[in-house]
């Protein structure tokens, strides 16, 4: 094969690729403009207290029934302050405002629920342990102290720190959950 035939073959392959890219671009633009022209536009009635002077809902234009739900959510959330994109959040005022007795009652209810869940599991077991004189002791699962915590002095050049992660689980669980995680860093 000569240089000319190789160059012509390369040029033809390059031309075919370019034509395919242009065809994909034309199809994409056609779909975009077809979607804009086919939509029906309706004005959303204003529900502002000022009679619609500064109503953001009147400026919103709906196009499809599917979009109506999304725009309705935007209109409903106009007065909601922006939340930071960080997982760590402060506790809500409701949680801070609850008296200490209510918190203790809530904790006692949670413990009762845990104990109720454990009792049916143990009810199915045979009574051999009671016959032998042994007692069943319900112990809560706690973290055992690690070797590092039991040492009197820390290792040289190692820093231990405790990190608290607070996760907001949304509307389903209104109180944020916090988890502690320990890690060590070498200097």
Swiss-Prot record:
The lineage's top-level taxon is Eukaryota
Q: Which residue ranges does UniProt annotate as crossing the membrane?
A: 8-28
Q: Where in the cell is it found?
A: Membrane
Q: InterPro entries, alphabetically?
A: DUF4642
- Predominant location of this chain? membrane
Compositional bias, Polar residues, is annotated for: 137-149
Q: Does the keyword Transmembrane apply?
A: yes
Q: Does the keyword Transmembrane helix apply?
A: yes
Pfam families, from UniProt? DUF4642
The UniProt keyword set, sorted, is:
Membrane, Transmembrane, Transmembrane helix
Query: What cellular component terms from Gene Ontology apply here?
Result: membrane
Q: Which membrane topology term applies here?
A: Single-pass membrane protein
Residue ranges of the region described as Disordered? 99-153
The identity of this protein, by name, is Uncharacterized protein C2orf74
